[in-house]
Amino acid sequence: MTVYNINLGIGWASSGVEYAQSYRAQAFRNLNISAKFVFSDLILGNNIADLTANLGFNADQIIWLYNFFTDIKIAPSTFLLDTFVEQNHLEQRNFSLLPNNGTKELQYKSEEEKLTIVPRYNNREKQTIDQVTYIFNNRLIKRDFYSYTKYATEYYSGEEKDNQVIFREFYNENGTIAYTQHLDGDGHELFEFPDQNYYSKTDLYREMLRKFNFKADDIIILDRMDEDKQLVNGQLIFEHHLPAKLVIPVHADHYDKHYTNDHQVLWNNFYEYQFMHYQDVAAYVVATDRQRDLLASQQKHFNHAKPQINTIPVGSLEHLVKPKGTRKKHSLITASRLANEKHIDWVIEATVAAHKIVSDLTLDIYGEGGERSRLQNLITKNNADSYIKLMGQHDLKDVYQKYETYIAGSTSEGFGLSLMEAVGSGLSMIGFDVPYGNQTFIVDQQNGYLLPYTEDWSNSRKEQLLADAIVKNFTEADLTSFHEKSYSLAESYLTKNVAKQWQQLIGELQHA
């Protein structure tokens, strides 16, 4: 039996879906269940093995569409700079190494060949590289990609104004070309193999599914589908998953309440296809009981259907994290992508207001995203740089325990992994009474404050509610009691307990 987990892309700053897969991978490892994680985006900015290892995946768990048709293994970048220099005879060809200013890129230049070769360090200390760029007459013409060997090359048109990739080669271990991807510049592509051509990425994906040769005891967990305009993967999986069982996790609010009434429902567009084809789905998995009950009632009302819906948290805790010392007094932490929908600006404004009463109050904001500069400007505008800080991207598992309280401004979380990790470190919690994460991890007056929320309220009213809760939390609340309640809530999210829920579902599906 193998569990195939279907995704599209992954990066250094991943979303909740990738983190959910990472937690699931850990649960499956604990159960000794064979699991594969399938990615189909063209991921060349970094070695996919490095990106997935960053989230705790094992390299042998990863299947990447573009690598699948070669015999090169998914593996870390271990190719040495010295090996590259030697193999390409750079010294004999009289290439000179230009002074390096400490960046990840080196420049080898030949005036005679009018060529600059730019290897990029993957790890400067280990002297390993993951990319090499070739610039001829000041124009990019080629880029090679390395793990333990060269696995791909992309070739550019070399034009002055519209220099774009015209084809890519993907290699086998012995250096032979496994296949070539041709691009016409208008979004069309052709994958040329020695014995066959595939005229779209969708066709190539279909061939990969065919080669998986699904068995009756296999399970496919479809985490993401159809965000890539070059690929229609969701429909393909619905069409070709048999005899395996198909499971659909719901990672977000699954419908739009503004356009839903007794006569119609507007499903979240990322899940509409999956909900309308419920006959093909062995089970839906949601993160909270509240979402399970709502989805079940909507399926019954609108589709006259009664599909199997299981509650399994998308995250889990290896263990409860107790503070190694004294928690920093009057300290707030929040962690998320720096995106508009997270409403971190409300949290900043609330902290500024509360700071007037709790004078040693601090807020540390963890995460990266497109809103970073705007949020920094807001902090500076409020003269709050001394007590509100953007901390960047970090592994927070052992960071939460340094703080007293977690605060969330988000008004919609399918689950809220950072909320789970915060209660697992015993923090008191502040957030709005909105589906589904806050309602799961905040018990009002017991481990924090679950604040009333109406969308139509002004931002200043929402900010004031948060500010009042901050002040109350640090001036009136029994934080020791709040911290103990958070630890108690977190018990059911320990990996060993979540793994049992997966084990039960998989057992049911195998015997269905």
Curated annotation (Swiss-Prot):
Q: In which pathway does it act?
A: Protein modification; protein glycosylation
What residues bind N-acetyl-D-glucosamine, as annotated?
H251
Q: Where in the cell is it found?
A: Cytoplasm; Cell membrane
Catalytic reactions of this protein: L-seryl-[protein] + UDP-N-acetyl-alpha-D-glucosamine = 3-O-[N-acetyl-alpha-D-glucosaminyl]-L-seryl-[protein] + UDP + H(+)
| EC number(s) per entry | 2.4.1.-
Task: Name the major location.
Answer: cytoplasm
Topology in the membrane? Answer: Peripheral membrane protein
Keyword Transferase present in the record's keywords: the answer is yes
Q: Does the keyword Flavoprotein apply?
A: no
**InterPro entries per UniProt:** GtfA, GtfA_EBD
**PANTHER family referenced in this protein's UniProt entry, alphabetically:** GLYCOSYLTRANSFERASE, TEICHURONIC ACID BIOSYNTHESIS GLYCOSYLTRANSFERASE TUAH-RELATED
Q: How does it assemble?
A: Forms a heterotetramer with 2 subunits each of GtfA and GtfB. Part of the accessory SecA2/SecY2 protein translocation apparatus.
Q: What is this protein called?
A: UDP-N-acetylglucosamine--peptide N-acetylglucosaminyltransferase GtfA subunit
Which gene is the coding source of this polypeptide chain? gtfA
